[in-house]
């Protein structure tokens, strides 16, 4: 294997900048104004400000880019710097660059429903205008309840008259099909679809963005990517911690609403879609919508809902189950784990179960896609062989590996499980992977919507899950308990087994980068 030669930061950023200028309408001479609505919030300090800093540090932002924070809290730029800088991962040598970054930052404290405040914001934005035109990017780092008022005031008062205007909307995009449609219709009455960027940071993950290349560039995978060869698929999202500090967000509709309905379903689309006619954003999203239209509403009989309980053998947070969290209402039936089986009813995937699993307070942090292939006909090894699997690990330790059978070294003719492995940290030791938000925000500057959710995608996703969510809300059935730090409820394993997934538990992938 050829060794990867490390590029300097200047070389890497120079190459990327050249690609940006060739691929997109990316004008260095224009003034760009990045407005963060909700600048004092957790998302802004942990993700948005650090991301803008990394792009600024690497020279990937246009020269005249200004960051404007807007919130109803009485903060200053100094306050913003104090709370966000710990997430910058900066070094003492970068202090001059940091000073330059915050010199491009300003802050405004006012109410979100005060029209006069938006007029004042617009005056401040006009004062920053230094080029032939000004482009404005509004990031709504707000609770969804504030979207209507804020977008209306932005549209009426603050949009650029000489350049483009783009708006980033954070998930969740509604609570069900009706509320999502109402929100989409409201925003569509103010902005065109090519101005709206519905962001889900999982679509910016390196391995997720690699899915289309794996599928449509490698001839070895094309002929086997169908129901004739694949027995079932699982899409897994696991977190080792509970709801600590985030109860109010999760409690709305549970983990189906938070994780399964959007990030997992979006990854399913990339795995199941047909080959688009090009890498144009709308061509890709057209084929994602076609896949979603082939998925029927989730059947309650194909769903397991569960809620974590305390683990008396552990310490710390694990000793407190979800019902014991003082922020949780007594008798809450919110699910913290869910497993559901979907079917894509088309020629390629007819009969193949797509298993979606997500949960909190589990035994590990992991997000992955697992394709399990059909058994080999004519078994001559007396059922000693396990199914082949293609595993796409999104986090942690990004990897793509194929689990297959080989002869165990030694005197005897016995097969054992092994893998063909592309571990990103091992293969690309000298390559810096951009953060997911870094990729996506740069995409917004460039005008690329490939990795953002379109309104018709959103509508189809809610069509699939809304009946189930309404059933859960109506019935208020008590979820099945599982122990904090476990694999989840046994009933989820039984559901997977019932639809054809084979879990042997005899093999665990070892990250070679840590050996």
UniProtKB/Swiss-Prot annotation:
One of its GO terms (cellular component) is cytosol. Its main location: cytoplasm. Pathway: Carbohydrate degradation; pentose phosphate pathway; D-ribulose 5-phosphate from D-glucose 6-phosphate (oxidative stage): step 1/3. It catalyses: D-glucose 6-phosphate + NADP(+) = 6-phospho-D-glucono-1,5-lactone + NADPH + H(+). NADP(+) 2 binds at residues 357, 366, 370, 393, 401-403, 421-423, 487, 503, 509. It is an enzyme of class 1 (oxidoreductase). This is Glucose-6-phosphate 1-dehydrogenase. It comes from Bos indicus (Zebu). The lineage of its organism: Eukaryota, Metazoa, Chordata, Craniata, Vertebrata. The gene is G6PD.
């Amino acid at each position: 294997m050829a060794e990867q030669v490390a590029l300097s930061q200047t070389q890497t950023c120079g190459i990327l900048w050249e690609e940006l200028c060739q691929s997109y309408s990316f004008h260095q001479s224009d003034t760009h104004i990045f407005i963060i609505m909700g600048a004092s919030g957790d998302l802004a300090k942990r993700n948005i400000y650090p991301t803008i800093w990394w792009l600024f540090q690497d020279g990937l932002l246009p020269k005249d880019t200004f960051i404007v924070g807007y919130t109803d809290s009485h903060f200053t730029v100094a306050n913003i710097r104090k709370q966000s800088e710990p997430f910058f991962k900066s070094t003492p040598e970068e202090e001059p660059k940091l000073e330059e970054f915050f010199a491009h930052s300003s802050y405004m404290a006012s109410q979100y429903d005060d029209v006069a405040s938006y007029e004042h914001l617009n005056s401040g934005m006009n004062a920053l205008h230094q080029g032939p035109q000004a482009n404005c990017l509004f990031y709504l780092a707000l609770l969804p309840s504030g979207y209507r008022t804020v977008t209306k005031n932005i549209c009426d008062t603050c949009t650029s008259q000489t350049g483009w205007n783009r708006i980033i909307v954070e998930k969740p995009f509604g609570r069900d099909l009706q509320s999502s449609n109402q929100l989409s219709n409201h925003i569509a009455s103010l902005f065109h679809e090519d101005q709206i960027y519905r962001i889900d940071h999982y679509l910016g993950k390196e391995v997720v963005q690699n899915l289309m290349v794996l599928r449509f560039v490698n001839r070895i995978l094309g002929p086997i990517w169908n129901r004739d060869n694949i027995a079932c698929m699982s899409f897994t999202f696991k977190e080792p911690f509970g709801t600590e500090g985030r109860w109010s967000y999760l409690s709305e509709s549970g983990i189906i609403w938070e994780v399964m309905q959007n990030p997992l379903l979006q990854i399913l689309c990339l795995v199941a879609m047909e080959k688009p006619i090009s890498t144009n954003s709308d061509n890709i999203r057209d084929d994602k919508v076609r896949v979603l239209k082939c998925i029927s509403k989730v059947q309650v009989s194909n769903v397991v809902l569960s809620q974590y309980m305390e683990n008396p053998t552990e310490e710390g947070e694990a000793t407190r189950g979800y019902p014991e969290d003082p922020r949780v209402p007594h008798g809450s039936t919110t699910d913290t784990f869910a497993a559901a089986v979907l079917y894509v009813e088309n020629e390629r995937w007819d009969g193949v179960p797509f298993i979606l699993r997500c949960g909190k307070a589990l035994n590990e942090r992991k997000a992955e896609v697992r394709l399990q292939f059909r058994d080999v006909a004519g078994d001559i090894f007396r059922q000693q062989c396990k199914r082949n699997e293609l595993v796409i690990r999104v986090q942690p330790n990004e990897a793509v590996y194929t689990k297959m059978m080989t002869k165990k070294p030694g005197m005897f003719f016995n097969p054992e499980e092994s893998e063909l492995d592309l571990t990103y940290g091992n293969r690309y030791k000298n390559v810096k992977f951009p953060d997911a938000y870094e990729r996506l925000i740069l995409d917004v500057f460039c005008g690329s919507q490939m990795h953002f959710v379109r309104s018709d995608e959103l509508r189809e996703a809610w069509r699939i899950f809304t009946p189930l969510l309404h059933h859960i809300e109506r019935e208020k059935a008590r979820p099945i308990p599982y122990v904090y730090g476990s694999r989840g409820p046994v009933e989820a394993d039984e559901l997977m087994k019932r639809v054809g997934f084979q879990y042997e538990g005899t093999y665990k992938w070892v990250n070679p980068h840590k050996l």
